[in-house]
């Protein structure tokens, strides 16, 4: 007697069709296309989680650069000056200070200027 494993295959199909419920057209109705779009969506989600880290870093650098230029330094000069002064602060914290606490950010700029000799 041949066993087709109907319960598990039905469960698998149900899971995928539930996931693609909001998709359009045949991607939602036909199992073979739904499966492809399901795996494609998971791939995009995986890639997005990886790209998010770089995107946030770009945003932080842009915010720091704007605030540093308002204080009279370029971004790369600020970072180099902080490294020369042995100040260990990451870009996320610098960006937070630049947006939410400009006075303390100016202190870091002054430390960097002193280390650079400006």
From Swiss-Prot:
Disulfide bond residue pairs: none
Gene3D superfamilies: 6.10.160.10, Ribosomal protein L20
One Gene Ontology cellular component: ribonucleoprotein complex
Keywords in alphabetical order: Ribonucleoprotein, Ribosomal protein, RNA-binding, rRNA-binding
One Gene Ontology MF term: rRNA binding
Highest taxon listed in the record's lineage: Bacteria
Biological process annotations from GO: ribosomal large subunit assembly; translation
This protein's record includes keyword RNA-binding: yes
Family named by the database record: Belongs to the bacterial ribosomal protein bL20 family.
Role of this protein: Binds directly to 23S ribosomal RNA and is necessary for the in vitro assembly process of the 50S ribosomal subunit. It is not involved in the protein synthesizing functions of that subunit.
NCBIfam families hit by this protein: rplT_bact
Protein name: Large ribosomal subunit protein bL20
Organism listed in the record: Fervidobacterium nodosum (strain ATCC 35602 / DSM 5306 / Rt17-B1)
